[in-house]
Amino acid sequence: MKTFYLINHNQFLNVLRLAITVLITGSSILFADCSQGSSSGPKKEVFPILASFGEWNVSKDPSDGACWASSKPLNTSTFQPHQAGELCRDQPRISVLFVDNNKVGQFAFDAGTNLSAQHAASLQTSINTLPLELIQQHWAWVFSTEDDQRVISSLAKSSFAEVTFQTTNGIKATDMFSLRGFNEALTQAKVTCGLLNLTS
């Protein structure tokens, strides 16, 4: 029997709004400049990067103990309908968050701009394609703990992942992420949250 998220994903949203690291160092700009206030996403508090593995970073919010591994895309492809406008967005990312001593991480995609609630995003790896049907503002999730497990297992066995989505103004886009360092970052996030002891 599936366990469906209701409260958990709302908590996830609140935690990540405040906690997720803005990963902007050492990268080229993959999206339009939103510095003039045109971005639809909220401002994000920057937390220190505790460890880095390949394209993945590990951070923690000391106020509530939440830990996460996250990565920004390598590149973005857009498919814009006529007069849809440019894709103006904050830094997009995919993340796996550990909160409330839950050993099953919660996967999320932050598009950096508001997503169309009528069009599910999708995550594609070399293993499978999984829908991200739970949409709230610029976030997209899977529905259940079992789906999170499938996503994480698929990411762990792949080299790259693509998230395809549609924004509220009709722009379709695909973000490509490298999974180099994903397994190591996931392990370190668990260690940081006290969910895993590598010395025992």
Regions found by a protein language model. Give the residues of each.
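Bacterial N-terminal signal peptides that target proteins for export
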Residues: T3-I20
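Compositionally biased regions
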Residues: Q11, S28-I29, S39
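Hydrophobic h-region of N-terminal signal peptides that target proteins for export
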Residues: V22-D33
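A residue-level detector for conformationally permissive "hinge/kink" positions
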Residues: L18-A19, I24, V46-F47
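General N-terminal leader/first-domain-start detector
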Residues: K2-T3, S27
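A generic "folded-domain core" signal
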Residues: A32-S200
